[in-house]
Every structure is written in structure tokens, then in C-alpha cells.
Amino acid sequence: MNLLMGYTYLIPILFASYLIGSIPFSWILVKVFYKRDLRSVGSGNIGATNAFRVNRGISFLVLLLDIFKSVLVILILEKMCAHKSIMYLTGFTVVLGHIFPVWFLFKGGKGIAPTIGVVLSINIKIFFLFIITWAVVFMIFRYSSLSSIISIISSCIYCAVTENFNSSIFYIAMSIIVLIKHRDNVIRMINGTEKKLF
């Protein structure tokens, strides 16, 4: 695996991870089963939350598939005995592909599902912290965006404290981008116009 750490091997792996991350499962499933363009529905975001506005069942499938994108890539690297920091970097690339897919002029989802896949595959403690935080915040406020934001922040802090620098820096960078993608949600919450999921 030492050879894999060289740039010759790492660059194509990161490129492949980006392409896997950029697969727009939400857009594909909504288009195939409902003949609708998800970009013209609700917030226009091609993610699981917006797919929920079309059909709850399809949104759950989208969530699982988007999580699986990260899980698949990281499990392959784990089989190749990759260092944890490389797993975080590759997971980061999957999330970038999800958020900035080349197929839609780099306008994609907000990165929550593939981020969940990253921590599920690498650090189960961060995964449970993320899920529990999301569930508690959602039960109180009913805002998916607020739940995601607080979950990202709490998991980011925990990762920074418990992981080494080389690993945590990639998760922190990934978290910052995911938070930036939620800036419109923050503005709507401040203005009182953010819609609750249900």
C-alpha cells in the first residue's frame, strides 16, 4: 500500500472518487419513477431532503445510495490497507463530487448523506454522535437543515479532538464546505421563511 500513497496512484483514486460522488441518484430516481426534474421541485436542490418533497420512500432510497457512495470508496481503500488520513481525504473527494457534480454545472446536493457515509466507514463514534445529534435537534425544531448544521459542527469538534491532525483536517475542510452550502438555509431561518420538513 506504500506505493498507493504515491501521487501516481492517489490522483486517479481521487478522480474516481469524485466521479462516484457526483452520481446524482436523487435526480435519476425522481426522473425515472416520477418523470420530474428535481431541480424544479421545492428548493431545487438535488438531495435526499428535496426528494422527500416528491416521495418519502424515494428520498429514503436516495439517502441510502448517497451514503453508500462514500462507504463503497472507503471500504475499497480499507481493503487496500490505506492510512486513515487517505480514507478521510478520499471521503472528502466523494463529498465534493456530490456537492459539485460536473453533470449539473457543479450544482449538486449539500453533502450530508455522503458525509454520514464517511464517518460510518471510518469512525463509528462520530457516526453515532452525528445521527443522535441530528435526531434530537430535529425532534425539537423540525428543521432538517438546522439538524444537519448542528450535527456537522458537533461531529467536526469531536473529530478534531479525537483524531490526529492529518485525518481531522480533511473532515474539518469537508465540514466547512457542507456548512457553506447551508448558508441559504441559515438566512431563511433567521428571516423565518425556512420550511420545516413536516
Swiss-Prot record:
Query: What role does it play?
Result: Catalyzes the transfer of an acyl group from acyl-phosphate (acyl-PO(4)) to glycerol-3-phosphate (G3P) to form lysophosphatidic acid (LPA). This enzyme utilizes acyl-phosphate as fatty acyl donor, but not acyl-CoA or acyl-ACP.
Topology in membrane: Multi-pass membrane protein
* Documented EC number(s): 2.3.1.275
Q: Could you tell me the gene encoding this protein?
A: plsY
The name under which this protein is listed is Glycerol-3-phosphate acyltransferase
Instruction: Cite the source lineage.
Output: Bacteria, Pseudomonadati, Pseudomonadota, Alphaproteobacteria, Rickettsiales
Q: Where in the cell is it found?
A: Cell inner membrane
Look up keyword Repressor and say if it applies.
Answer: no
GO biological process, any: phospholipid biosynthetic process
Molecular function GO labels: acyl-phosphate glycerol-3-phosphate acyltransferase activity
**EC class of the enzyme, as a word:** transferase
Q: How does it assemble?
A: Probably interacts with PlsX.
